[in-house]
From Swiss-Prot:
Quaternary structure and interacting proteins, as annotated: Component of the TFIID-containing RNA polymerase II pre-initiation complex that is composed of TBP and at least GTF2A1, GTF2A2, GTF2E1, GTF2E2, GTF2F1, GTF2H2, GTF2H3, GTF2H4, GTF2H5, GTF2B, TCEA1, ERCC2 and ERCC3. Component of the 7-subunit TFIIH core complex composed of XPB/ERCC3, XPD/ERCC2, GTF2H1, GTF2H2, GTF2H3, GTF2H4 and GTF2H5, which is active in NER. The core complex associates with the 3-subunit CDK-activating kinase (CAK) module composed of CCNH/cyclin H, CDK7 and MNAT1 to form the 10-subunit holoenzyme (holo-TFIIH) active in transcription.
GO cellular component: core TFIIH complex portion of holo TFIIH complex; nucleus; transcription factor TFIID complex; transcription factor TFIIH core complex; transcription factor TFIIH holo complex
Protein name: General transcription factor IIH subunit 2
Organism (species): Rattus norvegicus (Rat)
Leader peptide range in chain numbering: none
Localisation: Nucleus
Span of zinc fingers (C4-type): 292-309
Gene that this polypeptide is encoded by: Gtf2h2
Membrane-spanning ranges: none
Residue span, VWFA domain: 60-236
Amino acid sequence: MDEEPERTKRWEGGYERTWEILKEDESGSLKATIEDILFKAKRKRVFEHHGQVRLGMMRHLYVVVDGSRTMEDQDLKPNRLTCTLKLLEYFVEEYFDQNPISQIGIIVTKSKRAEKLTELSGNPRKHITSLKKAVDMTCHGEPSLYNSLSMAMQTLKHMPGHTSREVLIIFSSLTTCDPSNIYDLIKTLKTAKIRVSVIGLSAEVRVCTVLARETGGTYHVILDETHYKELLARHVSPPPASSGSECSLIRMGFPQHTIASLSDQDAKPSFSMAHLDNNSTEPGLTLGGYFCPQCRAKYCELPVECKICGLTLVSAPHLARSYHHLFPLDAFQEIPLEEYKGERFCYGCQGELKDQHVYVCTVCRNVFCVDCDVFVHDSLHCCPGCVHKIPTQSGV
């Protein structure tokens, strides 16, 4: 467990002339070098998409947010806490846009304790509202990785075997105050097939390195706010499923939203199953909702697993929006601009091609700029040229 892979220590490595990477242009500016670094980062994201790999598309993710006194540091503006909560709002929106049949929950750890900010839910508005309110939260004390992971594990270990169980920790402190041996907990997490990833805001911490390595997660330390946002974006796409995860057909129900009229004499207010379990401040008795087609249990939101009969309840658009993960769009062919003989305008945005390289779809042979290339692969998930070409071929 405690043995780290052999690698050369920083002071044992060869002398690196890192400043030679930076090159001035004719005007003495470093802008060209910086743009080249950003360009390579954008292209790397496109190629990092997993191809024909079995993915854990039904995800259950707990985000653990450090609420210790270190979150008041102002190296991120206006401070670490506010910056983190704003980026998490964006992350939640992207997460549900890319993973509509998944759920997320938020845990805050401070003063050696852990408490749930939100329960596992598929409703992004609920999480974003809680994150907005958490801006006024007081940061004090030390975080507890042990208590946070234990709280997340108590819920995740009961999730079905065909779903992915994940924890993402936003860790600002350099210490953790734990009531027991965290290395024993790491073994338990590994046995329960819970994948833990960490994003550090200060520096690398050994226990986080071991935690991520043993559970199959990732561990990165941010450089600045832009890098922070990119690291969060890496956790939007579903991870590859482990070889030991269950693979079977899943029964699903597709309930329609029913709204009863106040003038309907047979309409009877009823509680949602979610309100019965949680201490929610929202009104519990409502006339409408989603009713399980198998046992008629009522729910206010989808997706959800029925607490009575265990049936997974989703809507058809949820499945349709998850389809692109199974068949990701192939990366476009990269060609130097001076070697490209076609039109010098991007097919996507119709802007003039000014970058050093252009990107050509291998199917329809249309050309794109780097920004449209990234947008097509990250958001559209289909080539506009190929989509417009299909009706022409069929004679429509």
